[in-house]
C-alpha cells in the first residue's frame, strides 16, 4: 500500500475483536481496502448497510464460502480472493470475485513473479479440469524451514521448469485449472 501512496491503518486488538468498532474505524479513517480472513469479514459485514460500499475487500487465510462472497460483492466496492501459504509470503494467487460467485471459490491466477504448477504424484502436468497437487515457485518463495532440513527437503523441491537451482514449494493442496484459466 505504501508504495502506491496509500496509508496503512492498523486496528487495535480490541477493535479487531469487535466488528462494530472495526467498522467505525474503517469509516472514521476512510479505509479504502482491508485484508481479513473470511471469518472476520463475516462478522464485519453482518448487519452492515452501506457502511463499507467504498472498501475493497481482500479475503485470504481460509477458503471463501460462496454465500460470504456474494454478501461481500453486494456490500463492498470490490472483492479479491487471495491464496498463498506462509512459505510463499502469503499471497501467491488472486481472483476477482463477482456477483455470480458459486460455491467453488476460484483462487485465480498467480501474482507477478510467481509460477504455479499442477502436478500428479510423478510431477507430470495434469490436464485442464483434472485434479492435482499445487506447486508454487518464484520470487516470493521461502528458502525453507529454519532448523528443519528434513521438512525443507520434503516440501521445497527442485523446480524442473525454472533456472538451475530453482526450487518450488509442494503445498499439499489439491486444485485444478478451470476451462477459463483459473485455479479452483
Protein language model features and the residues they cover:
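Adenylate-forming
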Residues: 3-106, 113-115, 120-125, 150
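AMP-dependent adenylate-forming
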Residues: 78-81, 96-184
Amino acid at each position: 500500500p505504501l508504495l502506491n501512496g496509500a496509508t496503512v491503518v492498523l486496528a487495535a486488538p480490541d477493535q479487531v475483536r469487535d466488528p462494530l468498532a472495526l467498522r467505525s474505524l474503517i469509516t472514521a479513517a476512510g479505509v479504502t481496502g482491508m485484508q481479513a480472513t473470511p471469518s472476520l469479514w463475516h462478522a464485519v459485514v453482518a448487519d452492515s448497510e452501506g457502511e463499507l460500499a467504498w472498501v475493497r475487500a481482500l479475503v485470504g487465510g481460509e477458503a471463501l464460502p460462496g454465500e460470504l462472497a456474494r454478501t461481500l460483492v453486494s456490500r463492498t466496492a470490490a472483492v479479491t480472493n487471495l491464496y498463498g501459504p506462509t512459505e510463499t509470503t502469503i499471497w501467491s494467487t488472486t481472483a476477482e470475485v463477482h456477483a455470480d460467485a458459486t460455491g467453488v471459490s476460484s483462487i485465480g491466477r498467480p501474482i507477478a513473479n510467481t509460477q504455479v504448477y499442477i502436478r500428479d504424484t510423478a510431477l507430470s502436468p495434469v490436464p485442464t479440469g483434472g485434479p492435482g497437487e499445487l506447486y508454487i515457485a518464484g520470487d516470493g518463495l521461502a528458502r525453507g524451514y529454519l532448523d528443519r532440513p528434513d521438512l525443507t527437503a520434503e516440501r521445497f523441491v527442485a523446480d524442473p521448469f525454472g533456472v538451475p537451482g530453482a526450487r518450488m514449494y509442494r503445498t499439499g493442496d489439491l486444485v485444478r485449472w478451470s476451462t477459463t484459466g483459473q485455479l479452483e
